[in-house]
């Protein structure tokens, strides 16, 4: 199992646009078979800092996500909204190890 944290620093005047585009991408991502979670988290002290927490079944699922049309649309749409380049960190899950505990029921499916 793979967890990816993507830190996005958004231009303050584009936060609403970024969130709209990101929520559309998150909804599509949750329909992918290898995506277990896709959380969009906004910093309470700095609304222009958004954290994406993406949980994938494995590295192949992460690679498949990056090859989807909806990801390409999101990437291109938000490119000019960034205050600085996005930074991602990949993590291995130590606990819990069961993938069933990570899957979230999608309210959008």
Which role does the model predict for each range below?
Residues 2-9, 39-66, 108:
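Short, well-ordered beta-strand segments in beta-rich or mixed alpha/beta enzyme
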Residues 20, 24-36, 55-90:
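An amphipathic, aromatic/His-enriched active-site/gating alpha helix that lines ligand/cofactor pockets
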Residues 14, 48, 70:
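Short phosphate-engaging motifs
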Residues 40-48, 76-109:
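Glycine-rich beta-strand-turn "strand-cap" elements at beta-sheet edges
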Residues 10-18:
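Short, surface-exposed ligand-recognition loops at beta-strand->loop->(often short) alpha-helix junctions
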């Amino acid at each position: 199992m793979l967890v990816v944290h993507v830190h996005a620093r958004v231009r303050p005047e584009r936060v609403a646009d970024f969130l709209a585009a990101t929520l559309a991408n998150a909804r599509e991502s949750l329909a992918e078979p290898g995506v277990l979670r896709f959380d969009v988290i906004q910093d309470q002290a700095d609304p222009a800092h958004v954290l994406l927490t993406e949980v994938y079944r494995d590295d192949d699922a992460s690679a498949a996500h990056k090859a989807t049309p909806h990801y390409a649309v999101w990437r291109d749409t938000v490119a000019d909204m960034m205050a600085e380049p996005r930074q991602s960190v990949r993590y291995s899950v130590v606990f819990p190890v069961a993938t069933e505990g990570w899957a979230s029921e999608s309210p959008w499916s």
